[in-house]
Amino acid sequence: KVKVGRFEAYDMFPLNQDTFVEHSGNTANDLYDDGSGYIYMMKEGRGRSNAGGNFLVSKQLDNWYFELNTLLEDGTSLYNDGNYHGRDMEQQKNVAYLRPVIAWSPTEEFTVSAAMEANVVNNAYGYTDSKGNFVDQSDRTGYGMSMTWNGLKTDPENGIVVNLNTAYLDANNEKDFTAGINALWKRFELGYIYAHNRIDEFSGVVCDNDCWIDDEGTYNIHTIHASYQFANVMDMENFNIYLGTYYSILDSDGDKIHGDDSDDRYGARVRFKYFF
């Protein structure tokens, strides 16, 4: 199959049903909020960007699935407000993310998948240093693995869906690792995500909304998230309401000179969905 346009490719960090986690972002845009910590979920090259488009080829061979997604976009759209490690990113050219995925389903319920994503365009964006030299910041390569047990495929009423996800990002002056597990049963979803950020260089950041990261160091984010679905509201088969909430604890190895040692964040959302 060949697909061209603005869409999302294979999900390498599934959170089960409609889930609200503020730090994660929802598309290829604004995923990285400078100073807030980063929950990397293999989304940077997945697509549905408002600053570019996708070209995807895929093939199903028995119980194997192969996919290659190419995302072309303005790479600075990854960053909320265009900032990375306290610097404003300057676009030189578009990025091109290549994102190959391999998935294997030995049974109807169980699937294991592995993937990577990488920007293959050098000097796509960066900053100009004090000597007037352009410093590339667009080198980003991520790896991910996911295992899913979907009991709903054989038991639509009482089946359990469990996801175990891991992801690792190697970027300019930053290394990120994320692991998560979540389960869905009877329309109730509960999950936990651990994210570890290691930042090797930072120029400082100025913001008005309690920036948590403002220096190099190691940072950990622990997040619990939950969701519940009200199905077929008002006896309408395609109308569902989702309640989502999360709570995050952020801690660091800091010395309390460059910001707080810990912080917590939380949120809730109600989403109405009608499927035409």
Predicted feature locations:
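Outer membrane beta-barrel
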Residues: 1-73, 94, 103-106
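Outer-membrane beta-barrel pore domains and translocons
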Residues: 7-11, 60, 69-73, 97, ...
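Solvent-exposed loop/turn segments connecting transmembrane beta-strands
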Residues: 10, 15, 45-53, 73-74, ...
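Outer-membrane beta-barrel proteins
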Residues: 13-16, 66, 75-80, 121-127, ...
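Flexible, solvent-exposed loop segments that connect beta-strands
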Residues: 27-43, 79-89, 123-138, 200-215, ...
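Detector for outer-membrane/organellar transmembrane beta-barrel domains
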Residues: 62-63, 100-229
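Loop-centered beta-sheet repeat module
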Residues: 67-125
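Outer-membrane beta-barrel "beta-signal"
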Residues: 230, 263-276
